[in-house]
Each structure stands twice: as C-alpha cells, then as structure tokens.
Amino acid sequence: MSFSSQSSKSSAESTLQKFLSGIVPVEAVQAGKARSQSKAQSVNNQLKTRALSADEVRRLQKKAKLKQQRKLKKQQEEAKKVNKLAKHQIIKSHKENNELTVEEEKYLNKIVKRNANSLSRLSEIEDYELKSELESLQEEILAAQRKSNKKTKQKSKKDFNEKLKRGKISYPGLTPGLAPVGLDDDDEDSD
C-alpha cells in the first residue's frame, strides 16, 4: 500500500496496531511502536524535506507585500477621514462662535465653490437644447445597435439553415428520409 505522506502512513499504522492489540499479544504490538515516529516528528520531517522554489518564495513575498500595502492604504484613508472630520468639526464650532480664521474661511469658501460647481453641472442638463441633443444621440446609438443585432440574427439564422440542409445538425421533429409526423399515407396517394 502506498501512502501520500509519512504522517498518513504513521496514522494508518497506529490505527492498525490499536485494532490488533486485542487479538495479537502486546509484545508484538510494542515492537511495531518502537519503529514508528510520533506525528510531530513526521510533520517536522515533511517540512524539512519540502523546500520552496524561488517562484513560490517570490509569489508569497509579493502577496505579503500587496497585503501590507492594502493595509497601509486603508489606514491612511481612515486617518484622512478622521482628520477631515475633525477639521470640519473645528470649522463648524468656530463658525458658530464667529471665530473663523482667514485660512478656515478660505477653506470653507473652497468647499462651497466645489459643491456649487457640482450642483451647477447637474443642473446644466436641464437646458432644453442640450437635453434634446442628448436624446437624439441616444436614439442614434440605439438604432445602430438594433441594426447590428438584426444583422447578427439574420446571419445566425442563415448559418443554422445551411447546417440543417447539410445535415450537420438535427432539428427536433424532422426525421431524415421519412414523412413528417402526423401525415397520413392517404394524403400522398391523392397527389
């Protein structure tokens, strides 16, 4: 019997020895135990014999480095969020107490401008001419897609019919060389 590893072999031997201890005298079983290694020793031997290749080492190092970079990036993002939140809280409290510094006022104006610009970009679509141009462009794109879909459907149908004629594929309900199902022989005689 071949074993995939030394630990599985020693495990099988110990199980067999336990089973046979009730049948065979104890001295014979103990002689077999002296030969076998403990599980810890067999695992240790396996680890020593298995050496990592250079590619495996490089891959493992790369994985560890990427994991560490992700962790560092996440920590930096969290720190930025905390700093930004703290800064906003300080500015809010200073504004309520009318104690804004020049830099805080500039920062607040910058945020207001940024938010106003994003709102104005969203509201520009409300312009009727721009809206109509966007709709016409969408219609053109959809028409082009429908046209290409129609061409591919026609081509696939044509290919299917050709394969059916050549006999490369079979179609349910058609039996080669026989009359279609449900057709009586009397109908053929009347022709």
From Swiss-Prot:
One of its GO terms (cellular component) is nucleolus. Its main location: nucleus. Residues 34-91, 145-191 are annotated as: Disordered. Keywords: Nucleus, Transcription, Transcription regulation. It comes from the Eukaryota. The keyword Cell inner membrane does not apply. The keyword Cell cycle does not apply. Residues 35-48 have a biased composition (Polar residues). InterPro entries: Rrt14. It is found in: Nucleus, Nucleolus. Residues 60-73, 82-91, 147-156 have a biased composition (Basic residues). Involved in ribosome biogenesis, probably through modulation of rDNA transcription. Belongs to the RRT14 family. This is Regulator of rDNA transcription 14. The lineage of its organism: Eukaryota, Fungi, Dikarya, Ascomycota, Saccharomycotina.
